[in-house]
Every structure is written in structure tokens, then in C-alpha cells.
Amino acid sequence: MFSGIIQEVARVDLIHHYGDSMEIGIFARNLVDGVPGSSIAVDGICLTLVKREFELLFFDVTEETMACTTIKNYTVGSMVNLERSVRLGDEIGGHFVSGHVCGVGTIIAVEKSYMFFKAPTNLVPYVLEKGFIAIDGISLTIAQVRGDIFSVSVIPETRARTSLGYKQVGSHVNMEPDMMTKMQVDTVMRFQAEKIGK
């Protein structure tokens, strides 16, 4: 479990494809307490730290993860968000994030205080005004929604401390809706489907 508060923006230093999977190495200066076996969110994707060589963190990525996230688009030099899993007693500064990416969206516009995204069809029911969403692992509040297009307010501090400062129009991002919102919407939809079926 994660909180959506990014602890470091780090650089992809190594990519090695083998079979249908791949290994990535990320150069992280500040994530000093990551040990092999621990869970770390990389752009909102929950990955297991396989090994560590000083400041270089290594992760194995499965074919399934590559298929449903932006990780397949990484190149050496890509800048990514990192967050270690929360521990008992940690402050939850954002919202609960599972690290299970539900879809890939696209940045369609960038303004001074707002960014606009196109959500994949399967996420649209869960994108609600004033609700939470994790974008590349960042806990953000949805400002406005128009169909599959939504906006979030992004303060300069967020741009500076996350990979959003490196993004541009057309960039793809990982999306995970707020799990509480998803549970509530799914329950209502299931209830309505059962009612119609009777």
C-alpha cells in the first residue's frame, strides 16, 4: 500500500529485455531504506526490489505489467516517480494507493495551474469531480470531468517534486482510481444490474 506522496524522482539507468519480461535499473539517491524484497511504487506500479547495488535499484517486470502500464515505453534516461510502501505509523499525506494500475491515460493539455487528461474507457465511471486519482503514482484531486476528459490542479511544488515536470502533451501516464470510489461505484453498478435482471 502507498500514499501517493512521491519520495524521489529518479532516472532509469538500465533496461534489459529477456524473453517476454525485462529488468530495469533505477538510479535513486534518496530511497536509502529500500532493501531486496521490499515493495516500491515506480510511477504508481507496485514492483518488488530484487537487488540493490549502492544507489542502483533493480526490478524485474513481467509481461503482464509491461502490457498494461507505461513501463514498456521506458528508455534509459526516463525520469520516474518512486515511493516506498507505507509502514505502520506513517502519515498518509495523499490517499490509499494499491500500486495496481487500472489503465493508461494521455495528457491532452497543460496549463499554468491545470493539466488535462484523457482517461481510458474502463476508468471513466470512477473519475468523479473532487475525487482522488493516482497518476503515475501521484495522489491528485480531480477538478472537472467532461466525459472521458478530466482536469487536475497542479501546484508548482508538485511539478517540481514529481515527474509531471518532465511530461508534455501526448505523454502516456499510469492511472489508478481511488479504491474507495471504485468499490462504491462497482457496488451500485452491480446492484443496478441485479435489479434490472429480476
Swiss-Prot record:
The keyword Transferase applies. 2,4-dihydroxypteridine 2 binds at residues 46-48, 60-65, 99-101, 130. One of its GO terms (molecular function) is riboflavin synthase activity. This is Riboflavin synthase. Pathway: Cofactor biosynthesis; riboflavin biosynthesis; riboflavin from 2-hydroxy-3-oxobutyl phosphate and 5-amino-6-(D-ribitylamino)uracil: step 2/2. Its EC number is 2.5.1.9. It comes from Chlamydia muridarum (strain MoPn / Nigg). 2,4-dihydroxypteridine 1 binds at residues 4-6, 139-141, 153-158. Homotrimer. The keyword Transferase applies. CDD domains: Riboflavin_synthase_like. Keywords: Repeat, Riboflavin biosynthesis, Transferase. It comes from the Bacteria. It catalyses: 2 6,7-dimethyl-8-(1-D-ribityl)lumazine + H(+) = 5-amino-6-(D-ribitylamino)uracil + riboflavin.
